[in-house]
Amino acid sequence: KSWVNISSGIPSGAYTRVVREDTQRKNLLFAGTELGMYISWNGGKIWKPFQLNLPVTPITDLKISHNDLTIATMGRSFWVLDDLGLLRQFEGNKTTFKLLTPEDAIIGNWSSQLNYSSENFSGADDSEGVNPANGIVFYYYLPRKSKNKELTLEIKDKDGNIVRTISSKS
């Protein structure tokens, strides 16, 4: 048996402490290093930085459980990336529109930063958690060089009847 170097994209000096493969998507890897998080979509052939809002800090352990990625850090406590479903659906730089499969949702009556659609929305307060949105949140991928400037999403019931139409047109 022989060793294969799978550190392409992780800088020299970013000593890797932990590597975990996703429990559902083969070849989706997460690496915790001295200089933060990295992700590989191809079994470790190429790594990309994956910090999101996580400060650059040593990552000491990773655990994938209940569809979440839990990150243990050196001096910054634990971080949790909720719902790996979006990452599992990501397919790289696509040239066409793609609607990602939404997670199951519950209709409720509570306040959430995710309920607002305003140009002035600056995100949630750092000192507060965020309640889930009321209803379904749709995520989609739209290529930068798309010729279509308008999007229309039709939501249908189980019989194919349109129950709601959402458009990007003002």
Predicted feature locations:
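Solvent-exposed loop and beta-edge segments used for protein-protein assembly and interaction
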Residues: 130-134, 145-147
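Beta-propeller blade termini and top-face loops
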Residues: 1-126, 133-139
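A short beta-strand motif that forms part of the nucleic acid-binding face
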Residues: 44, 157, 169
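Beta-strand-rich binding/interaction modules
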Residues: 138-139, 146-166
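Solvent-exposed beta-strand/loop surfaces of large extracellular or lumenal domains
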Residues: 55-58, 161-170
